[in-house]
Design a protein with these regions (language model features):
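Alpha4 helix (beta4-alpha4-beta5 surface) of REC/receiver domains from two-component response regulators
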Residues: 62, 75, 85-101
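Two-component/phosphorelay signaling modules centered on CheY-like receiver
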Residues: 8-29
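Active-site-proximal alpha-helical element of nucleotidyl cyclase-like catalytic domains
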Residues: 185-205, 212
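Catalytic-core segments of nucleotide cyclases and related cyclic-nucleotide turnover enzymes
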Residues: 226, 258-300
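Conserved nucleotide-binding and Mg2+-coordinating catalytic segments in signaling enzymes
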Residues: 130-149, 169-183, 191
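Short regulatory alpha-helical coupling segments
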Residues: 130-131, 144-163, 194-201, 218
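A short pre-motif secondary-structure segment
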Residues: 205-208, 248
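Hydrophobic framework residues that shape the active-site pocket
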Residues: 174, 193, 208, 213, ...
């Protein structure tokens, strides 16, 4: 686990770090609780926070509460408070402030390791629940809701002057695959195309529904996104699947758009969708960009 430990005493920090590091944990220690909170905020790899109640400038209870707000639906974070004054009031206040557990200070090695094993079990279950809630069960890509959220977060990180581009993809004449070869083969085709989306490094890939997919590309220009869509289009034409009536070959159409200042992810998707429609109605197996005046006018 990646563990942050907060205590005003460097001696206590050294003792706890000495207990945890030999067990394979990554440990960062802080005497300043505000610095600790900033570190936890900026490092999603942190899965456990151990804090004394007697910390400054942010008190231990406030630190628990603030850290708990970071542990949203996408980030497991197990919080353990510790105090040399163990009593019912301190325990209740800590748990009410978002702590998951309470331990004496200084903790005994056996108890500390046991409680961290419990923390590992809990965060492991939380990660699995998050995975199930965000993943499309057929393809392993993000589902629509999770994709929109992740793409929105990427756009927020990019800021007003950042770059993010969007690719929408749709398997051409997919209904005929299901009709001629059955839904099992259709599912295999969907999984095959989905795997191609994962070949674009740094992309956020999702299945929006049916045979439609989306790929958000943070930091990519329109030209770079067009090139990526071109590579994906070519790879899709090279896919072969075993069907009930012989080999199955498919193609896909692609719509591409890029970020405009003040635009939402919804607007980015809308323009990519209009470009995708243009690709499908002008021959299929094409890449069309939303940069043309015609498509921009339709998006407006």
């Amino acid at each position: 686990m990646h563990i942050v430990v907060v205590d005003p005493s460097r001696v206590v920090l050294k003792v706890i770090s000495g207990l945890l590091t030999p067990r394979g944990h990554t440990v960062d220690t802080f005497t300043d609780s505000r610095e600790a909170l900033d570190f936890v905020t900026d490092n999603a790899s942190v899965t456990a926070l151990i804090t004394s109640l007697e910390v400054r400038p942010i008190g231990g209870l406030e630190l628990c509460w603030s850290a708990r707000l970071l542990a949203d639906a996408h980030r497991p974070l197990y919080i353990i408070t510790m105090s040399s004054a163990r009593n019912a009031r301190n325990l209740a206040e800590a748990l009410d402030s978002g702590s998951d557990d309470f331990i004496d200070k200084p903790p005994s090695p056996e108890e500390l390791h046991a409680r961290l094993r419990a923390a590992e079990r809990m965060t492991g279950m939380q990660r699995e629940l998050i995975r199930l809630a965000e993943t499309d069960s057929l393809t392993g890509l993000l589902n629509r809701r999770a994709f929109l959220q992740r793409a929105g977060e990427a756009a927020d990180r990019a800021g007003a002057h950042g770059r993010i581009s969007m690719i929408l993809a749709d398997i051409n004449q997919f209904k005929s695959v299901n009709d001629q070869h059955g839904h099992d083969v259709g599912d295999t085709v969907i999984r095959g195309v989905a795997q191609e989306l994962l070949t674009e490094a740094g992309g956020i890939a999702g299945r929006l529904g049916g045979e439609e997919f989306a790929l958000a590309l943070p930091g990519r220009t329109l030209e770079e996104a067009e090139a990526a869509a071109g590579r994906l289009r070519l790879r899709c034409t090279q896919l072969r699947f075993k069907g009930q009536r012989g080999p199955v070959q498919v193609t896909a159409s692609f719509g591409v758009s890029t970020w405009s200042e003040g635009e939402t992810v919804g607007g980015l998707l809308k323009r990519a969708d209009i470009a995708l429609y243009e690709a499908k109605t002008t021959g299929r197996n094409r890449v069309v960009s939303a940069a043309t005046d015609l498509i921009l006018a339709r998006a407006g």
